[in-house]
Amino acid sequence: MLRSSIAPGRQLLSNPVRQRIPSQWLSRAGASNRLAGQVKRTISPSFLFLYTHNRHAQRFFADSKPPTTGGPTPVSPSSESSVPPETISKAAEQESKLPPSPPAAAPRKSGRFRRFLIYLILTSGFAYGGSIFLALKFDNFHDFFTEYIPYGEESVLYFEERDFYRRFPNALRHPNRLPAAPREEGKPVTIPSKSGLSWKVAEEQKADADSKKAEAAHEGQIKPAAAKPEERNAAVVKAKEDTASKHSTKEAKPESEAKSPVSLDEPRKPAVSASTIELLQLQDGDDTVVQDLVKTFNDIVTVISADENSNKYSAPVAKAKGELEKIAEKIAAIRSEARNTAQEELNKLHATFDESARELMRQFEEVRSTDLASFREEFEAEREKLALAYQQKVNTELRHAQELAEQRLQNELVEQAIELNRKYVHEVKSLVEREREGRLSKLTELTADVNELEKLTAGWSDVIDANLKTQQLQVALDAVRTVVERAETPRPFIRELVAVKELAAGDAVVEAAIASINPTAYQRGIPSTTQIFERFRRVASEVRKASLLPEDAGVASHAASLVLSKVMFKKDALSEGDDVESVLVRTENLLQQGDVDAAAREMNTLQGWAKILSKDWLGDVRKVLEVRQALEVIEAEARLQCLRVE
């Protein structure tokens, strides 16, 4: 399980981090302790004296030089001096007892593979645990995890069992203890004497007893679905009377039977027959499954009634009868609810289809108002075809319903014939098989009708989606036009243009129209017609001042042109000519009429300083015209797409 797979990972995670470093420290500490012990054991007093003497005799550069005295200098050894052998042996022993030099430290390993392995195990563990959590939360991921991941099913089962035991802690304490059934207080049942097993071999019973038992069993085996209500009531009344008479005779002669001696040679008397239990009858049990269940239950009741100890089964049989009646009522309620739900869904679908058809016709009438006369006949013909198709479909459904009702009645008659004529079972089975094949063929036809309806629904859905997309594109165009024409100041319309582009995704005409717009136009906005007209007035005054300037004018020419522009007479709007004043007057008149395109064309005919001064104004007007032209192209494309929908 999951524990067996996670335990090695935990050991790998715990061993290198928790055990390696202390072991290294302990090994190093042990080595240092051993080295210290060896040094302590090998250092002699003479070595300590020499070490301390040399340490005290050592002088650093920062220390002051000790003053030299006139003391005697040590005598240097001469070649003639002799060394005693005891000193040489002691020095050799001291040198041999010195500890060896510590080994060089091994190069430290980088541990990249170990870190990679640790990170890989951690990542795998977290991913596996997260996958188990997702498998417990989501059914789709549960199927994928348990089918394709190793040990996935065992892990999920383990955690599900833990969750179950956490929710139900008492489930393990009494796993086999069942809740005690309520004790039914019924009538006391008296078991007649000698009704059980005995040591004596059973002898042949009398012929009349056998005939009575066979007749009773045969009458009890008749099912309620085959017999009529009057016959079933008569059988029940007869069984009750026989039971009452048998009980009275049994109560009247208990003492005589007890006093009379039992003879082993005479044949045994047949057991007293028990009372007949009433068969189950359902008023609304027209379902095949319910009828089969009632037949099976009545067969069981008949067998129990034929037994001599049927009284002790009366209470459970009555309880089971009540449960079966409740089940039959629930099945009838569920069938009626399902039938009502299906009818409501069918009505909703019809209403939706009718509403969609009306909406589509209304849109077609709005778009094709100019061609209403030519297409009216086709529209009427299509509507008649649809009505005829719906009428044929309704007639087909009614015919199918009638055939199903007739088939149900025929099946009931066949079942009754089966119950009355058991010797023709084989022929009845063949008939049922043929009827089953007929049902399968009708199911195939119904499936074909459903597929055709799905295709029709998909077609209507495509038409509705296309019209909805066209309406959304038109709304987006209106939003862009509102931002462009009704804004008091130039506003960027990037979001509106992006919405138009997303709605017309895949349309080359719309994308080309949007690409033709200058980026600065939708990033900074474009002026409205009023702003263009106001700016034209300011530009016109500057152009009039420079209208008399030649191309190579100087300061004097500028001053003269400024003075003469004040005394120039304005011309009429209908005046013709290529001079600056005539062009400005015609442009102003066109702007007042709202014809920005013609006004821009007039201003574009200027030359020299007048054209240079009006260059910025012409650039803004060009951006406005580009945006308007693009919007007109997109709107025309949207209308064309709407006309293409069939």
UniProtKB/Swiss-Prot annotation:
Cellular compartments per GO CC: MICOS complex
Subunit-level organization: Component of the mitochondrial contact site and cristae organizing system (MICOS) complex.
Region (Disordered): 61-108, 173-269
Coiled-coil regions, chain positions: 317-455
Segments traversing the membrane: 116-136
InterPro entries: MIC60
Positions on the Mitochondrial intermembrane side per record topology: 137-646
Comp. bias (Basic and acidic residues): 201-221, 228-258
Superkingdom of the source species: Eukaryota
Full protein name: MICOS complex subunit mic60
Family to which this protein belongs: Belongs to the MICOS complex subunit Mic60 family.
Signal peptide: none
Cell compartments where the protein resides: Mitochondrion inner membrane
Mitochondrial matrix side: 62-115
UniProt-listed Pfam families: Mitofilin (PF09731)
Its biological purpose: Component of the MICOS complex, a large protein complex of the mitochondrial inner membrane that plays crucial roles in the maintenance of crista junctions, inner membrane architecture, and formation of contact sites to the outer membrane. Plays a role in keeping cristae membranes connected to the inner boundary membrane. Also promotes protein import via the mitochondrial intermembrane space assembly (MIA) pathway.
